[in-house]
A protein has these predicted regions:
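Cytosolic, membrane-proximal regulatory domains of ion/volume homeostasis and mechanosensation machinery
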Residues: 1-3
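Membrane-proximal, non-transmembrane interface segments of integral membrane proteins
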Residues: 6-7
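Terminal helices and disordered tails flanking the catalytic cores of nucleotide-processing hydrolases
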Residues: 10-174
Length: 174
């Protein structure tokens, strides 16, 4: 799939979720969470992939290996969710939890410092992008949310000891 097609599939999950929620008569506040949790944020991974692909084609054009007609147009708005941005504190928190969980999970095994840095980057990115402007969260709220996320992520990502497999037939030496 092209980056544009991949982005469309990912972005469409919001409207698919809203339709499913309405079909099942979920309460309006839950429909709002589904509809608003990505706001108008950028599907950055696929946008970046589209820009890289465009740059590769441009290089091929410069080398005479491709036609200028082959260069795809990359329009940022095509890689943005349709919104609206979160309209309540609860929806703002869900949207932050969604991005923090998916981003930290994709990082694999990380240190506490790396995790904290990534959480801080993600929260800052959402604030700067205006994603939280309409939901009523304060900077004090964001500090509490950040601390809660980090505490939760630490408990999820902490190292665990490797337990031996359980074999009831094995004799235990005394």
């Amino acid at each position: 799939l092209t980056p544009s097609m991949s982005a469309r599939i990912i972005i469409d999950h919001v409207q698919d979720g809203v339709a499913l929620a309405r079909e099942n008569n979920l309460p309006r506040p839950l429909v709002d969470v589904i509809e608003q949790h990505h706001g108008t944020s950028l599907a950055y991974f696929f946008y970046r992939k589209a820009l890289q692909y465009r740059d590769e084609i441009l290089s091929r054009v410069e080398s005479g290996l491709a036609s200028p007609d082959d260069v795809p147009e990359v329009v940022e708005s095509n890689f943005r969710y349709k919104g609206p941005n979160p309209q309540s504190k609860e929806t703002g928190i869900v949207s932050l939890a969604d991005i923090v969980e998916s981003a930290t999970r994709s990082m694999g095994k990380i240190s506490c410092e790396e995790m904290q840095k990534r959480v801080d980057e993600l929260l800052k990115q959402r604030v700067v992008d205006g994603h939280l402007d309409d939901c009523g969260l304060t900077f004090g709220d964001l500090k509490k949310i950040r601390n809660s996320f980090i505490k939760t992520l630490k408990s999820i990502h902490h190292n665990r000891i490797a337990y031996p497999s359980h074999n009831p037939e094995a004799k235990i030496e005394k």
